[in-house]
Amino acid sequence: MGVAMTEGSFIPPVKQTILTVNDKDEVVIWDDAPTPKLPADQVYVRIHAVAVNPSDTKMRGDFATPFACLGTDYAGTVVAVGSEITHVKVGDRVFGAQNEMCPRTPEQGAFSQYTITRGRIWAKIPDSMTWEAAASLPAGISTTGLAMKLLGMPLPYSETKPSKKTYVLIYGGSTATATIAMQFMRLSGYTPIATCSHKNFDLAKKNGAEEVFDYRDADCAQKIRDYTRNNLAYALDCIINVESTSTCYKAIGRAGGRYVALNPFPEHAATRKMVTSDWTLGPTIFGEGSTWPAPYGCEASEEVRLFGTELWQVASRLVEEDKLYHHPLRVIDGGLEQVKQGMETVRNGELSGEKIVVRFSV
């Protein structure tokens, strides 16, 4: 495990400041956290911006590893490179995802001063992209890719395309994941349609939805069936409650189809045998499995690890070619205290049509 660094360059500190959950199940700032060691096949990153995801707010109780680092999405500057890395150099800008609260690697997380990249779930930031935009993308990219895999959809740039116009319903079209999913699916040859509140119709259409439906409308599912001529075969649920599952199932056409949720869904609302269903867990993109409690726990998977590598190669090309844009951002200047406040904002349901990104003072 060698490390290659330029002469007189960065030497990792012994300790750093992170955001964590203590042994009393409280989210706290810890100033005496260990820093990660750099493997030969990764790079060391000084973090400039992080994004807050709903999943970050759920890392409590049985999901928490006391004093492990919180945070998934980050963007920062490479300050050291492993000896096996040849395509990245010190000073390059990168963005990526972390497997937060992982008991195997408690020192790795996004809500910190420094981190090391994980697997191949990271990429270089093009010159045209800001820190904040880059930091907002990783979780959405990873979750979208896993959902498309379960739906049986090819990734962008694949030679395989639908042979005819094929609709896919995105329930929760104004969420940050939906923003990424609609772009990926359109680039793969599908035609997204979406549900959201009326105030966010323009946002969903900007992100690629051909048509948008108000989820509060009692006739929402029937209107979707009418619009798709009873041929809808794919639904991605970004909200996951009884209403969302029921609407997706009712909207899918007479021939049936596939429903994928971003969390375990209420199975009693999944009422049609002609519809196959599944749900995805974003952190599995690393192929490392999960030690979270049932039903979230799973074994490591080489297949998923390889898929994650392929997905992030696609994502890297998309951002380099300026074909992937970010969700509307609420940018906050500061540090980990502002990240903690952002988590409370998300946890309290005070965010709609935006994603919180904290820009660190470095």
From Swiss-Prot:
Induction: Expression is induced at the beginning of the stationary phase, which is consistent with the timing of compactin production. Expression is controlled by the ML-236B/compactin cluster transcription regulator mlcR. Substrate binds at A139, G140, I141, S142, T143, T144, G145, L146, G282, P283, T284, I285, F286. It catalyses: holo-[compactin nonaketide synthase] + 9 malonyl-CoA + 11 NADPH + 20 H(+) = dihydro-ML-236C-[compactin nonaketide synthase] + 9 CO2 + 11 NADP(+) + 9 CoA + 6 H2O. InterPro entries: ADH-like_C, ADH-like_N, GroES-like_sf, NAD(P)-bd_dom_sf, PKS_ER, Trans-enoyl_RdTase-like. Keywords: NADP, Nucleotide-binding, Oxidoreductase, Transferase. GO terms for molecular function: nucleotide binding; oxidoreductase activity, acting on NAD(P)H; transferase activity. CDD domains: enoyl_reductase_like. Signal peptide: none annotated. Pfam families: ADH_N (PF08240), ADH_zinc_N (PF00107). It comes from the Eukaryota. Compactin (also known as mevastatin or ML-236B) and the intermediary metabolites Ml-236C and ML-236A are inhibitors of HMG-CoA reductase involved in cholesterogenesis. Their hypocholesterolemic activity might be useful for lowering cholesterol levels in the blood and reduce artherosclerosis and coronary heart disease. SUPFAM superfamilies: GroES-like, NAD(P)-binding Rossmann-fold domains. NADP(+) binds at residues 55-58, 174-177, 197-200, 215, 262-263, 280, 351-352. Pathway: Polyketide biosynthesis. Its EC number is 2.3.1.-. Belongs to the zinc-containing alcohol dehydrogenase family. Monomer. Dehydrogenase; part of the gene cluster that mediates the biosynthesis of compactin, also known as mevastatin or ML-236B, and which acts as a potent competitive inhibitor of HMG-CoA reductase. Compactin biosynthesis is performed in two stages. The first stage is catalyzed by the nonaketide synthase mlcA, which belongs to type I polyketide synthases and catalyzes the iterative nine-step formation of the polyketide. This is Compactin nonaketide synthase, enoyl reductase component. It comes from Penicillium citrinum.
